[in-house]
Each structure stands twice: as structure tokens, then as C-alpha cells.
């Protein structure tokens, strides 16, 4: 069997070997027809993979953490052969005492065990491979609770309301304020109640205060981390006093209830039997209270022990005790007051039993 030989290559042409191996780098034997001055075939170097960074979507916006939180960012990249990954913070080298970096074959990890506000800033990752380079920028913001407003002042108290003013805090917690929370407390209970939340101005009016109470006020600043740990309290109390009410009485005419006597229920005729007590009734209305006079056959019988006269709430009664045949006749009840008089009559018949 003849030995395998390399194919002949014309002068000035190229030979491309696919899937080359280190063994292929040995120079092939020249064919008998190949001249002494022909070029020797060489193995081409592998094509490099350009460096590229795959930045996670969550890191394309500002990455916000609270003071004391852990920052652990894994950034994948590509490049062949293995590229060189370099981190910077605001254009300067990282502080290795606080920030640690681990670079792998296809990713780089940025780790901060306990983030502080000084760790905020712009972090840049550069992946270099030969003369090629890819960069990615990550903005990290480390925030904490804001400081309290610098002061609070009770400006005015009127009616059921009080006006407050305060100044913004010096420290906003490394982020924008979301507003203020205003609370009130009366001196009787000492309990704090929120009256305003997420309030953006530095002055407000607190209404619906209760008469007779004294109030203190305090204001918290608020950001993404929450309310400030402390709040200033007004030194002056708001005393809600009851306004003196002056009543002006209007003159009015006193109603005159005076009237002359008038019988609303007259006497009724009756027939009785000898020896049985008999009562006569009538009703009268008058003001002032009238004087009641009883008559028999137009003769005054006041003071006669045979008769008993009573008057109560305008009801007049006359009791005839054990009437006899001579007690029959015309009985009259007369009512008299300064405005006039009135009278009613009835007939009483006394029968003797058989």
C-alpha cells in the first residue's frame, strides 16, 4: 500500500485545514513535483470571541439598598480566551477593605458585606481581551432613615385649629424625602394620633381640636426607609378655650291667659230619694282662679252644714247630705273673678219612697 501524501498545492495558493489539531502542525512531506522554493503550509490561530457583558435587567436602573444590607452582584460576560475583568468605583480603584471581587471564566461577582452610604456611586465593569473591551455601568444607592426636622413652631391658635411651621431635616438619608407625618397629643391622655401623612409642605393647619384640651404636636420626616427615628415637639401648647357666649334675649310680649269664668260642663237635672246623699257636678274655666258660690232658689247656702262644696282643678261639686222633701228646688253654681262671672242652674227633685 502506498503511503498517504499531502495534496499538491499550486504556488501562490493557501491550504485551510478544518478542525486542526497540534499534530497537524508538523510540516507535510513535499511531493516529488514540488519545487524547493515553495511556501510551507502553517496552522491558523483560533478565532477570538469578542468580549461582551450581559447586564441583568434589574441593574439597568439604580440599585437601591439600605445601610447594613449585603450587596452581592453577579455579572455574566463572554470572551474567549478568558478576558480580564476590572472594577472601578466612581472612576477609582475599589477599596479592597470593604469591597471584594471574584472573577470567574464567564462572570464577575461584586460583594459588599455591610453596605454603607459611602458605598453609593457609579460602579463600572470593564472586560478586556486583547485590544477589545466591553463596559457596563451600575449605579448603587445606599440609603437610611432621614434625620428629624430641625425645629417645629406653634404659630397661631384660633377657634378649633392650630397653625404649625417647621424646617426640613439636614440629613435626608441619601435620598429624596417622601413627605412629613404630623401627629398631635392632648395633655390628658398623652397618646399620639396622626393627623397628616405624606405631607409635602413645611407648614400646616391642624383642625377639629376639642374645646377644653391642650395639645402638643410633633413632625416626622419620611423617605423610602421609613420615618425618622425622632421628631421635634412643640415647646408651646395649643390651648383650645371655650369662647364666651353672649346671649341677647329678644323682647317678647307675655301671653295673657286671663279670662272670665266659663262653664265647660253645666249642671244636670236630677231626681233623688229621701235619705240618700246626692252630688251635683259642673266644670268651669277661668283665670285668675274664680270664687265658687252655690245657691238654692237664689239663696246662698255657703256655710250650711247640710251641704258640702268642693272645687279641684276646675271641677265643682256640691254634696246634699240625706236630702228631705224640702231640699228640692233650683240649684245654682256661680263663678266670679275680676274679669266677670258665670253661672249654671239645675233642678233637683226629692221623692218620698212609698
UniProtKB/Swiss-Prot annotation:
Residues 1-47 are annotated as: Disordered. Disulfide bonds join 282-333. PROSITE patterns: FN3 (PS50853), IG_LIKE (PS50835). It comes from Homo sapiens (Human). Belongs to the immunoglobulin superfamily. MyBP family. Residues 45-139, 261-345 form the Ig-like C2-type domain. The keyword Cytoplasm applies. This is Myosin-binding protein H-like.
Amino acid at each position: 500500500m502506498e503511503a498517504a501524501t499531502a495534496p499538491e498545492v499550486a504556488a501562490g495558493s493557501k491550504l485551510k485545514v478544518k478542525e486542526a489539531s497540534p499534530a497537524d502542525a508538523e510540516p507535510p512531506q513535499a511531493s516529488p513535483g514540488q519545487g524547493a522554493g515553495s511556501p510551507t503550509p502553517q496552522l491558523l490561530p483560533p478565532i477570538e470571541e469578542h468580549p461582551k457583558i450581559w447586564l441583568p435587567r434589574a441593574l439597568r436602573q439604580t440599585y437601591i439598598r439600605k445601610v447594613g444590607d449585603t450587596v452581592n452582584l453577579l455579572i455574566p460576560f463572554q470572551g474567549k480566551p478568558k478576558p480580564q475583568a476590572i472594577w472601578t468605583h466612581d472612576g477609582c480603584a475599589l477599596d479592597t477593605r470593604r469591597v471584594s471581587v471574584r472573577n470567574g471564566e464567564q462572570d464577575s461577582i461584586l460583594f459588599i458585606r455591610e453596605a454603607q452610604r459611602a458605598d453609593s456611586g457609579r460602579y463600572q465593569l470593564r472586560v478586556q481581551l486583547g485590544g477589545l473591551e466591553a463596559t457596563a455601568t451600575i449605579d448603587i444607592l445606599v440609603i437610611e432613615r432621614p434625620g428629624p426636622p430641625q425645629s417645629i413652631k406653634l404659630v397661631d391658635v384660633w377657634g378649633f385649629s392650630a397653625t404649625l411651621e417647621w424646617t426640613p431635616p439636614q440629613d435626608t438619608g441619601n435620598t429624596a424625602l417622601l413627605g412629613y407625618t404630623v401627629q398631635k397629643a392632648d395633655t390628658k391622655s398623652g397618646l399620639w394620633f396622626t393627623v397628616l401623612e405624606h405631607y409635602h409642605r413645611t407648614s400646616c393647619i391642624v383642625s377639629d381640636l376639642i374645646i377644653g384640651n391642650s395639645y402638643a404636636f410633633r413632625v416626622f420626616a419620611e423617605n423610602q426607609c421609613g420615618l425618622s427615628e425622632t421628631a421635634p415637639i412643640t415647646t408651646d401648647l395649643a390651648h383650645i378655650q371655650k369662647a364666651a357666649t353672649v346671649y341677647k334675649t329678644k323682647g317678647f310680649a307675655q301671653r295673657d291667659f286671663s279670662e272670665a269664668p266659663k262653664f265647660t260642663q253645666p249642671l244636670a237635672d236630677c231626681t233623688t230619694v229621701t235619705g240618700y246623699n246626692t252630688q251635683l257636678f259642673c266644670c268651669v274655666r277661668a283665670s285668675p282662679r274664680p270664687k265658687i258660690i252655690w245657691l238654692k232658689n237664689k239663696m246662698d247656702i255657703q256655710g250650711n252644714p247640710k251641704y258640702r262644696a268642693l272645687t279641684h282643678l276646675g271641677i265643682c261639686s256640691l254634696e246634699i247630705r240625706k236630702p228631705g222633701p224640702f231640699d228640692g228646688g233650683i240649684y245654682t253654681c256661680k263663678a266670679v273673678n275680676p274679669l266677670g262671672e258665670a253661672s249654671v242652674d239645675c233642678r233637683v227633685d226629692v221623692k218620698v219612697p212609698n
